[in-house]
């Protein structure tokens, strides 16, 4: 039987393949490696560099013996960080550049999907919430265009939130 962790993070300054070996020792066989931010990025090249780090970590996880699928996308919190330095339209544009980079990785078969896409899991001002919803909707549309899986990051998993997302 395959034992899968469907939301596994690795950090380049963390335990890396040692964490994967612990997972395998516990009976795990497969994992979905979900990209996470390794620091604030303001431009697309910094984001791409971080995703390339995730892809390298996936290679190390495979070398440790796990079957690995990778998902990558700009984390929802990154939109808020981009808003600190940019107008809403500029922040959205940079965010979508990152989404498009991630969809290209799906097309190149380097990843299986986009993740984590979503919304802040804490309260934000209504205009920011609205922008996060617009960005999420468009990001999911772009994921659908390349038949990519989507890993969602949401504020909770209540029936109300699920209805709002559908």
Annotate each language-model stretch with its function.
Residues 1-166:
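Mid-domain alpha/beta scaffold segments of enzyme catalytic cores
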């Amino acid at each position: 039987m395959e034992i899968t962790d469907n939301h596994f993070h690795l950090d380049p300054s963390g335990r890396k393949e040692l964490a994967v070996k612990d997972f395998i020792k516990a009976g795990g066989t497969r994992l979905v490696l979900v990209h996470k931010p390794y620091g604030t990025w303001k431009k697309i090249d910094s984001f791409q560099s971080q995703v390339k780090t995730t892809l390298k970590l996936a290679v190390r996880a495979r070398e440790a013996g796990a079957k690995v699928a990778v998902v990558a996308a700009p984390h929802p919190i990154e939109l808020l960080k981009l808003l600190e330095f940019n107008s809403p339209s500029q922040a959205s544009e940079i965010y979508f550049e990152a989404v498009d980079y991630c969809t290209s990785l799906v097309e190149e078969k380097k990843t299986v999907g986009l993740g984590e896409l979503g919304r802040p899991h804490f309260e934000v001002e209504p205009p920011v919430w609205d922008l996060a919803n617009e960005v999420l909707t468009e990001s999911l549309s772009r994921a659908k265009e390349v038949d990519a899986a989507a890993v969602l990051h949401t504020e909770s998993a209540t029936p109300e939130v699920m209805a709002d997302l559908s």
